Regions:
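Surface-exposed, low-hydrophobicity beta-strand/loop segments enriched in small/polar/acidic residues
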Residues: 1-199
Length: 199
């Protein structure tokens, strides 16, 4: 439309969860060697630490990286005394470093979960509408004012779980204001593509 100030952010994310995408099996004394530091989708993921030993209760891994808007964030993931996976709660777009509090009893690996987030726009915007192509599973797409960690969920949409079926919605009047920037949270496999319209 001529003269329109509406912009669009396109999100396509079918990158599966991978439990050793960031750190493959190793026993770092301090800082781990990173196999990868960002995701092919360009988005952010929750981080998961998996241990194989049973003597690692209360040992920690400190994750440093950036959030959906590129700001520096830190999270400490504490392992248990069992050989198991422990997931964090923050979304990392990039990973700068992972540092262990002590050497683990056996190999550990660090990867990503299927919980994902993406930036739509980092500044004040008005949401005008969205088009979501569903994946093979139903799930929520949550719209946050600000980051998922520190912002506020304004509303959510639900995919229908039928692969390649599209949901289109236009926000009436002046749209919905996101004064602290707009980000979305979703589960991989519930969306194939999203076009999010804002001004």
């Amino acid at each position: 439309m001529a003269g329109s100030d509406v912009k669009v952010t396109a999100i396509s994310d079918e990158v599966a969860a991978d439990d050793d995408f960031i750190v493959t099996a190793s026993r770092p004394n301090t800082t781990a060697t990173l196999a990868n530091s960002s995701f092919a989708s360009g988005g952010a993921r929750k981080i998961q630490v998996t241990t194989t030993g049973t003597g690692d209760n209360e040992k920690t891994n400190t994750i440093i990286g950036t959030d959906v808007f590129g700001n520096t964030i830190t999270e400490v993931i504490t392992s248990t005394g069992s050989a198991e996976a422990v997931s964090g709660s923050k979304f990392f777009k990039t990973i700068t470093s992972i540092t262990s509090s002590a050497q683990f009893a056996a190999n550990l690996k660090v990867g990503s979960t299927s919980d994902a987030a993406q930036e739509v726009h980092g500044n004040r915007v008005r949401l005008r509408g969205y088009s979501i192509v569903s994946g093979g599973s139903a799930g929520l797409v949550q719209f946050f004012d600000g980051t998922p960690e520190d912002g506020t969920e304004i509303f959510s949409a639900r995919t229908i779980g039928t692969d390649n079926q599209t949901i289109d919605n236009t926000i009436p009047d002046e749209g919905i204001l996101f004064p602290n920037g707009l980000s979305v949270v979703y589960t991989v496999g519930t969306i194939d593509r999203m076009n999010i319209f804002f001004s």
